[in-house]
Curated annotation (Swiss-Prot):
Modulates RecA activity. Belongs to the RecX family. This is Regulatory protein RecX. The gene is recX. GO terms for biological process: regulation of DNA repair. Disulfide bonds: none annotated. The lineage of its organism: Bacteria, Bacillati, Bacillota, Bacilli, Bacillales. It is found in: Cytoplasm.
Length: 263
């Protein structure tokens, strides 16, 4: 049975020591593991002892890495597991580390999911379907996801969607209502809002001001079109202006009405 012939401190890490068995380097361990297993010169170690020591060392090392990783922000169990796997911590040790992290309340997937929904709802204006997809990618169980999303009911979704609609309307104010609505619907769908919430948000954001906003946008685009075609009042140039505005999504009746007013 091999025995410890030498224990030496590592040059670059004073918290770890090298263990030599029968005059040959065998492995390194944390000082806490050294004390825990009462490792000293002359002690005999069989294969089971070595496996147990190395397992304890992997848990010690991985636990500290996990705590450091968690110090920046909350993480899901899957995120911590993936991180430790990349750090080459053995799977059995990772299981023990996760158990310890849960015991000390360093990780909790339900709390993580609730915080994630709250944060990304407010800061990134995301809808429930996108949040659900992102949480699933982070390894959160379905029941935890549903519980977390319960704090994001329809009224809050509508409130957030209306803010997004108003912001986009201001940004795209010189486009036709049709074109603006198309852009809004696409963007809010990508953000994870349902068709029902999007339609309600559009109704609430416009609140009966569609015609006024449409005419303002049409006047702006008409001046742009006239400059582009070199408008001189002729029938040919008038048709070119109408075609330009129609392609931009404006209604033909509205175009004729505004053109006639401007003559």
């Amino acid at each position: 049975m091999p025995y410890i012939t030498k224990i030496s401190a590592q040059k670059n890490n004073t918290e770890r020591v090298n263990i030599f068995l029968d005059e040959k380097y065998a492995f390194s361990v944390d000082l806490d593991v050294l004390v825990q297993h009462d490792l000293k010169k002359g002690k005999e170690l069989d294969e089971a002892d070595i496996i147990d020591i190395q397992f304890g060392d992997a848990v010690k090392k991985g636990f500290q890495q996990a705590v450091d990783y968690l110090s920046y922000r909350m993480r899901s169990v899957k995120e911590v597991t993936d991180y430790l796997t990349k750090k080459e911590i053995p799977a059995p040790a990772i299981s023990e580390i996760i158990h310890k992290l849960k015991h000390y309340k360093y990780v909790n997937d339900l709390e993580f999911a609730e915080a994630y929904v709250s944060t990304h709802r407010k800061t990134n204006s995301k809808g429930p379907s996108v949040l659900k997809k992102e949480l699933k990618l982070k390894g959160i169980e379905d029941d935890h996801i549903e519980q977390a999303l319960s704090q994001y009911p329809d009224d809050l979704q509508l409130e957030e969607a209306v803010k997004q609609v108003q912001k986009l309307v201001r940004k795209e104010k010189n486009r036709s209502t049709k074109e603006i609505e198309q852009r809004i619907k696409l963007q809010l769908q990508r953000k994870g809002f349902s068709f029902e919430i999007i339609d309600k948000a559009l109704q609430e954001a416009y609140d009966g001001q569609e015609e006024e906003k449409e005419e303002e946008a049409l006047l702006y685009m008409m001046e742009k079109a006239k400059r582009k075609v070199g408008y001189d009042g002729s029938f040919e140039k008038k048709m070119k202006v109408k075609q330009f505005l129609f392609r931009k999504g404006f209604d033909l009746d509205t175009i004729d009405h505004v053109l006639d007013k401007g003559e």
